[in-house]
Amino acid sequence: IAVTSECTLSVRSSLTTEDELNTFANRVNKPPVYVESAADYHEKRTFGYWSLPERKTESEAFLENQLDQLFDFYKNEIEARKWYGLFDYGDVMHTYDPIRHCWRYDMGGFAWQNTELVPTYWLWLYFLRTGREDVFTVAEAMSRHCSEVDFYHFGPMAGIGSRHNVRHWGCSCKEPRVSMAGHHRVYYYLTGDARIGDAMADTKDADLSMKNITYFQQKDETGSYVVIRSGPDWTSFLSNWMTQYERTLDPYYLEKIRQGIKDVSEMPFGLASGPSYRYEENGHLIYEGEDEKSPNMHLQICMGGPEVWWELADMLGDETLIKLLSVYGGFYYLTPEQKKEKTHGLIEKRPFAFPWFASDIGAYAAFFTKDKTLAKTVWKNLLNALIKIGDEVGFTPVCYATDDQKKAHMEIPWIKTNFAAQWGLNTITTLELLRDALPDTMDGVRKLIEEMPGNEFHRA
């Protein structure tokens, strides 16, 4: 792993005054960053599909307030919980413990987030749409941390990251989605930061390290081979290759991208196929049938997969990939009986869990196919994840204690960063694609979700 520090020198002809030293220190800590307006980025559709803030209707104002409250809560938690330290600063914690009124800092799998469910994407898109300096500062710190500490830069697991744990590198589960280049592309292209460029380049051949990780190894009579999932493994490779190709125009990575898209398009059910494939190092994905015991379908769409896919489709002008996404976004929301009918009985029992995680790809499908029923379904699931009849508190913090100085200590008792990152990201993207399908009033929102079972409420 890595931790990079910067040293900036200022040479003066005389002894530096205190004011000059403070000015210099402030400039080093907060160097100027050239940015365009949010409207300019949005007009060029920089970094995929994301919305500008609008508060023309009651429901839009509610969603924008929730997005603002969500970010402000995490910004304040960084200070309140002292999420600092050489190896920790920039990351946030994974799961809150309402009994102890603290984050589960001491429980493996519930401590540091390590990019799980892409809080990086949520924060960077939130910055692009708001232009807020404080958002940039938090997102920058996360990119600097995650691009250094959370993955292996060389060695047998080069380009592979470590899943969340009490220590960032402590989990035995090593995955490419933790380290994929897409986490940091926005920061790199906004600043040209050379160290981030190096870190992204360190991931370009992460697929070649998979043979060294036991979890991805299989054996048959011919020897060992690698098996990967369509997401988040293949999607992470695509992110790495896309970034390397757009920076270098190296055709090697473009061919690996095109090979995989071709392979998936020839599978019987497109992106729903598998979801695991035998993988060859030229990017070839070998379909080996359907796995009805797989629990991994939601991992295709909650680890940045849709964002990688649709940026890639736009970059390449790839109609095949656009069609694959449009079909899969609708397929995810079908009932098990409908899936069984569509696949001639081959896909039925496999869980397509967390339907609200699929809001972005569902919104993409509804937008491109003009499917109003699907659009309504997407909003139902996304809204009901945060609110339900009788509970519209959302991300409003509550006071759990006051200290000797009468300072209030705040919490959101049910919060998980998995939920925060995915709800923030999916709301930002769905507002762009399906704003017209959102009810204007909160009464309309209540009517939309009143028949929802409620089992996805605050679930992540």
Language-model-detected regions and their locations in the chain:
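Catalytic cores of extracellular degradative/oxidative enzymes
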Residues: 1-457
